[in-house]
Curated annotation (Swiss-Prot):
Encoding gene (name): FASTKD5
Name assigned to this protein: FAST kinase domain-containing protein 5, mitochondrial
Upper classification of the organism: Eukaryota, Metazoa, Chordata, Craniata, Vertebrata
GO biological process: mitochondrial RNA processing; mRNA processing; regulation of mitochondrial mRNA stability
Species per Swiss-Prot/TrEMBL record: Macaca fascicularis
GO molecular function, one term: rRNA binding
Phosphoserine, modified sites: 95
Amino acid sequence: MAATLKSLKLLRYRALCSPSACGAARSVSYWNVSSKQHGGQDPPEHISLCHSAKRVKNICSTFSSRRILTTSSACPGLEFSKTSSSKASTLQLDSPRATRVDEEDVEVFDSFANIRVFLQLRPEYRVHSYNASETSQLLSVSESELILHKVTVYQNKLQAQVIVDYLCKLSSLPAEQHPVLLRSTSFALLCQLSVKKIQLFDTQDLINVLKAFVILGIPHSHSMLDVYETKCCHQVWEMSMDQLLLVADLWRYLGRKIPRFLNIFSSYLNLHWKDLSLSQLVHLIYVIGENRQVSQDLMQKLESLILKYIDLINLEEVGTICLGFFKSKTSLSEFVMRKIGDLACANMQHLSSHALVNIVKMFRFTHVDHINFMKQLGEIAPQRIPSLGVQGVMHLTLYCSALRFLDEGVMNAVAASLPCRVAHCRSKDVAKILWSFGTLNYKPPNAEEFYSSLINEIHRKMPEFNQYPEHLPTCLLGLAFSEYFPVELIDFALSPGFVRLAQERTKFNLIKELYTLDGTVGIECPDYRGNRLSTHLQQEGSEFLWNLAEKDMNSKPEFLETLFLLETMLGGPQYVKHHMILPHTRSSDLEVQLDVNLKPLPFNREATPAENVATLRLKHVGVSLTDDLMNQLLKGKARGHFQGKTESEPGQQPMELENKAAVPLGGFLCNVADKSGAMEMAGLCPSACMQTPGMKLAIQFTNRNQYCYGSRDLLGLHSMKRRQLARLGYRVVELSYWEWFPLLKRTRLEKLAFLHEKVFTSAL
C-alpha cells in the first residue's frame, strides 16, 4: 500500500461539483438574498459549536468554489447608477442558510450564529446588539399594499419620520412576503426617498432603518448603503457607546464592511475607552475581529481592560476575546494568555468546542506554552474531535504542530475521524493537517488509510489549488516529512506553469517551499523523472535560505563559540566549514572531514588559499589538561559523563587548572611526550586537501525548537534532513542543546574535551 501511495498517478482534474449535483440555478431578484448572515465578507475560518449533526443533499462543495447567482429581474427603480446596478445584480451565495439542509451533519454549521452565542449570556448585551429573534406584530399584506400605494401617491411630500415609519412597518411583513416586497417598484421608490431625506434622520431613525434593512435582507453591495454609512460617520460623535456598538452590529448583520465608520469610531474610542463596561468591551472586540480593522494602540488599551475584568469574564466571552484578537492579527501578552489559560483549565469540561478552538487559535498565534492547558487539551480533545467540523479539527492540529506539542491521543483521534469526511475539507484544511502531522513527525496507527484519503482529496481539489496555490506545496512538504511522495502531484507542483501561477496569484513567496520540495525529491526519489525547478530558481532559493541561516547562526554567541572551539581543536578554520550541506533543508551545518586514519583534512578552501596548503601545520594551541580530562581523552571515558553532569555537585570544588602539560587536541590521540607542545601533521602536502575523505561529518548545532515539546524527538523537517544526510554518506554528529548549553558555563578545557569526544568517538 505504501508503494502505491508513493507512486500515485495524477488523475484528470475535474471540478468537484457538476451542474447536475448542484441543481438548476433559479432566477433570483437581486434583493432576494439572505445577506444578513455574513455576505460580502470572506468565509469565516472559525468553526461553530457542532452539538447536532446535519447531512446535506444535492449541494455543491462550498469549499471548491463560491457559487454566483445572476439576477434576471432587478428593479430599475433601485438602480441609482449603472455601477451599482451591475454590482448589485450579481450575488454571492455564501450563506449557510442558502443551502438545503435535510438531515443533521457535523459539517453543516451556522458559524455566524455561533460566534454570537456570547451575546445571549448577559442581559446587558441586549442594549447594544441586534437580536434577530426579536418579534414584532406582523403586518398584513393589505396593510403593506396600502403603505406602498401612499408612497406612490405622495412621494416627495412624505416627511422623514413617515419614511422611517413605513420602512419599519414593511419589515414586519411575514418572511415569505419579503421577496415580493423587494421586487416592488414602490418599495424601490421608498428607498430612494429615504436617501433623499437621510440628512433629516436622527440617530434612532438610522438605527431603526438599518434594522429594517437587516430584516428584509437588503444586499450588502447596493450603493444606497454607501449613503447610509456616510450618515453614520457624521453621527458618530452624537452617539452613545451603546448606540455605536449597535450600529456596528447592524452593519455586520448586513454583511457590509464599513472602514470609514470604524476609523471614526476608533478615534472616539481613544477618548472613551476607559468608560467601557465588560459587555461593551467584549462586544467591541467581536466587532473589531469581524471587520479585521483596528489600531494596535487601541488594542493595547483594550488589553488593559481585559485584565481589569478578567475575574468576571465567562468562558464564552474568553473565546470571543481570543477570536477578536486573532482575526485582527493582534497579539495578547504572555501574562494575559496565561490568565486565559488558567480560566480555561478551571472549567474546561464546560468550555464549548467553539470557544475552545478560539482559545487554541490565540495560543498558536501568541506561541505561549501553557503547560496545564496543553495537558488538559490532550485529555478533552479526543472526545471533542468527532463532533467538530473539519475546520475546527484543522485548528486543533495546527496548534499542536505550531507549539511542537505531540499528543498521540489527539493526533490519533484526528487521523481516525478524517478519512470518512475528508470531502468536507477545504484545500487549506488538507494542507494544514498534512503539514501538522509531518511537522510533528508522527504517523498514526491508521497511517495508510489516513494518508491515502488525503492524497486522493488533493487530486480532487486541484481546481481549488489553482485558486489558492500556496496550499499545494504545504501539502507535499507535509507528505515528504512523513516519507510519502505522490510523484504526479510533485511533477505538477514543480511544473513551470504552476510555479508561474504561484508567483502571480499569491502574496506569499513560495520559492523556499518549492525549493525544499525540489531538493528533497532529488535525494529521496532517485527514479523521479518529472519536472524540477529551473537552475535560476534553485539558485534563488539557495541564496535566500543561506542568507537567513547565516544571519541566524551568526547572531548566536553560543554557536560562534562552538565554531571557534572546533577550529582550535582541529587546527584552524581550514578544517571546519560552516555552510548548508543541504541548502533546501533550511539550516546550516558544521562540516568536518577525516581521512582513513581519522585525522582531520584541511578541505575548506574558502578559509585556506590553495597555494598555502603545503605550509599548513597544526599549531600549538596551548591547551592545559587536568588529570581528569586526560583520563577522559586517553582512557575513553564514556560520553555519558558529559550528559547531565555539567554542574558541580553541592560542596564539590570546581576543577582547578594547575601546571599541567600543554598539548594540542588536533589528532585522534594526544602526544603528551612532546615537551614543546607542538604537533605537526606528518606528510601534509598540496594533495592532502584533495584526497577522498574517509569520513564526512555533519555536525548539527541544535536547539529546543527542533524537537517536540518536552521531548528529544526531532521534528519532521530536521528528521528529514538527517535522513537525507545519511543518504549522501554523511555521519551526523549532534551537539544537542541539553548537552552543550550547560557546558557553556564550564571551562574552555571541558568544552574542548566534549567536542573532541563528540567528533572522534562518532567516527569510530
